[in-house]
């Protein structure tokens, strides 16, 4: 029996950079392997039993799909995860001895041709739109067209030859642009969010500040008005007379300006008189009445305005009822009525503090008294009518007595 040296050849030889005749300097030369009795183990093997070689070959060569080199595909190297079945490794021999790489080349050529088509598509569309595509071409145009075709061909060859380079560049560029867009969108979203939050806080702070300013201003004005009113109330009544005289001067100035000037009586005179009377009466309420609440102040103001509004409404209603238009004289009468009513309310409130509060009751009592007076007048007229009727009956009785005969009168006299 001859011991022949057969180096263990497998598909793993293609992964290493060693040749068939290389010797590992650390472990020494390869021992001889007896294929008949199997007494000699494979080189550098850790197996004690040659029968375990088929079971543990996956551990020996670390067969794993995740660590399989890319040169080994599923057709050339069959990998199993079970340890009992050894991998079925074999080589595929082609008739030509080389792999078929025609499909990837065609794919590369097609992908490289795509940018050229996309680049030429706008030019072709423009020429079609102008109706100048291959039409009326001269020598210069055909020369330019041939040069352009040459450039496109060279570009196609260049793109096909450097396919991996420019595809990686395009891929990196697209990924970079996508990341830029993503980062930009996230940044803009954060900016919008921060801006909205900032504006909301600004609006909130501004509203709180304005509310505090309004509150402080209102308190300050209320204190000023209260101090002024208390000071005037504690002073003599001559201040009230001075205010009334000032009011009268303003109203008469308006009258004279409207009479001899160019003021519109309907707007300037009536509205100014109402506003002046309301404002001065409001001030009078602060001076004369012994309370300083807004409730009584506004009640007096609305009562005065209500009375003046009633006068204006009645006047307007009467003019429209009788189909009359108010001329300058009518406006003077209306303004005079408002002026008289305002003065009357002013003096009445000055002499009797709190009179405006009692005015509704006074008006109701006045209306009731007026109606009672009308009723009494009606009763008196009825009594006068009854008396007149009795007088008529008396006259009728006297006429009946004159119609009696003389004989009957003698008999009655004897009886």
Swiss-Prot record:
Residues 11-29 have a biased composition (Basic and acidic residues). It holds the Pfam family WTF. It comes from Schizosaccharomyces pombe (Fission yeast). This is Meiotic driver wtf36. It comes from the Eukaryota. Promotes unequal transmission of alleles from the parental zygote to progeny spores by acting as poison/antidote system where the poison and antidote proteins are produced from the same locus; the poison component is trans-acting and targets all spores within an ascus whereas the antidote component is spore-specific, leading to poisoning of all progeny that do not inherit the allele. InterPro entries: WTF. The gene is wtf36. GO terms for cellular component: ascus epiplasm; cytoplasm; endoplasmic reticulum membrane; vacuolar membrane.
